[in-house]
Amino acid sequence: MRRILSRVRAAVSDYGMIKDGDKIAVGVSGGKDSLMLLKVLCELKRFHSEKFELVAITLDMRFNGKDGDFSEIKKMCDEYGVEYVVKPTDLYEIISNIRKEPSPCSLCSRMRRGILHDTAKELGCNKIALGHHLDDAAETFMMNLLIESRIGCFAPVTYLSRKDITMIRPLVYVRER
């Protein structure tokens, strides 16, 4: 954990990811990357020179019309003293039954991102933290190079002017292992 925290501190410092007074929405899917991100940001909050707030947000895709069970994430957030919001969506219904997308991943990703941005803004957040790590960056770089014949990757910090919110990726120096 110390190694991960050290790398997150370095990324936060190198890219100026967190400023005093930030309210950061942490996108929490329930997977290992987003849960590690939440844990590490809670640890960082304890001793970071800049004071900031965290809110964990999960988008409930409502697979087959059923609400998801996020009780374990809720329990974790309660232990860390982090506000937890589950945002119900109809994404599964829209993509699977209404749009009948043959390759839904790209559309679903964009729609999830939009809902996450809107939810974060509704909660008064000025930043959104995502769990993309170093291996994700390398994979994105290679996919862009091989599929689109371009050199590029996501930025560790991205300001979205249309939404007036900043995306941060504090795990960008952390290997997946």
Can you name each region flagged by the protein language model?
Residues 1-143, 147-150, 155-156:
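ATP-dependent adenylation/nucleotidyltransferase module used to activate substrates
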Residues 143, 176-177:
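Conserved, surface-exposed functional patches that form binding/active-site neighborhoods
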Residues 153-176:
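Short, flexible loop segments at boundaries between secondary-structure elements
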